[in-house]
Amino acid sequence: INIHWDRVEKEKGEFDWAPYDTSLDALLRYDIVPFVSLTGGNGMYTGTGTYDDPKLAAIYGDSPLPPLDDKGKAGWLNYVTTAVNRYKDRIRHWEVWNEPNHRNYWGAPPDGHAYGELVRYTVEKILELHPDAKIIAGSMAGISADFTDKFLSRCDPEKIDVISFHNYGNRPENRVYAIEKFKKVLDSYKPGFEIWQGECGIASTSRTTGYRSTGPGGPAIQAKWLLRQSFVDTWFCHATLSNYFKLFDDGELEPELTARKPSGPDKWFGAPERNGSRMHAEGVNAKCLLSVPDRTPKPAYYAYQNLCAAMDDRYKRAEPAYRFRVANPGQFHGIGEYEDAFPSVPLLAAYESEDAAFLAYWLPWIPQEYVVDFAKVSLEVDVSFKEPLLMDLITGMVYSIDVVTPGSGKSVFAKLP
């Protein structure tokens, strides 16, 4: 939950917590553990600013500046103090700011050193009031090793428990390329830093507000993407938590038209935010797992439900040796153990508990809405199974499956879809 400073303090010294009280009470009623981001400037103390780029200024409008001067810092720490004192009996996990490396959410050109200073004095205040608190910092838009290095150089890493990131895009696997440098930076400050992926999702339709990918949207695409994201985060990115954004949205299906007048290529393609990704500030965020307005579950909702039913934190990341062979590529033309194929073969994420193993595999193509001709692959893996089952996490269907055990601790599965 993002607790925005300027939403709770609209008059100096006067706080309205009612919406957050309602949300937190509902979460706790269902034994859901919340983590809260204290975030956003407040124009009464900090002033406001916007992008230099007129297109982005038209999309985002003005945002409060970050609380970096004496006046802003004093107001911010009063807000932090009030929030922590109010909720410390209900909240243990506190995150410092939402996406400080994003111009709109930071409120000014991103500055890792400035964010690090804000983390330093915010964390000191939280721990003074709530010594048992768990501190989350980073909350970056994307995975930025450089930004991480800058902010950790200005605060005390020993007082931070978790570093978090948010990573969108039409292929969850793309985030893997940034993780190695990111982890090296973390280890240089504190080996063993816990990593969370705190926010990310994909729209079930090409019409959405908020960030959108450049790929097509669809209900099945969303479900497949959600599952792939979960395994990419917890296996390839070493995250101990992978969060999906979001459950529901209360935006308007037919928002008012903006006053923007596109020019140049934008006349044909719309107004791109960046990299061809269009942005509308109002409407429905179609990344939600419940349809708008009736809130019926989408396929991704059930996929997430199936995943959470199938595994939990008893399973730990494992690294068994394995090899896929493509027997029939189906509609996925060109896959196989070829040097010039990308992606070539499925990926594997492996987890083990005290008495079981969980293997997830998928082909890292851009997700397809419809698959009419599945590929067939074989898997050799250094994990032993007594009674293996094959589960389709999209549908929840479970199937018996044959396994060959050529030797102790090894399994071979043939003709997997």
Residue map of PLM features:
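Active-site cleft segment of glycoside hydrolase catalytic domains centered on the general acid/base Glu
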Residues: 49-185, 206-228, 257-263, 374
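Aromatic/acidic polysaccharide-binding cleft in carbohydrate-active enzymes
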Residues: 208-214, 219-333
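Solvent-exposed loop/turn segments at secondary-structure junctions
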Residues: 3-7, 40-44, 98-103, 140-144, ...
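Hydrophobic faces of well-ordered beta-strands that scaffold small-molecule active sites
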Residues: 1, 34-38, 92-96, 135-138, ...
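Carbohydrate-binding surface patches
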Residues: 324-384
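Solvent-exposed beta-hairpin/edge-strand motifs
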Residues: 378-399
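C-terminal beta-strand-rich structural cap/linker in extracellular carbohydrate-active enzymes
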Residues: 402-417
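N-terminal substrate-binding region of glycoside hydrolase catalytic domains
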Residues: 1-82, 95, 101, 412
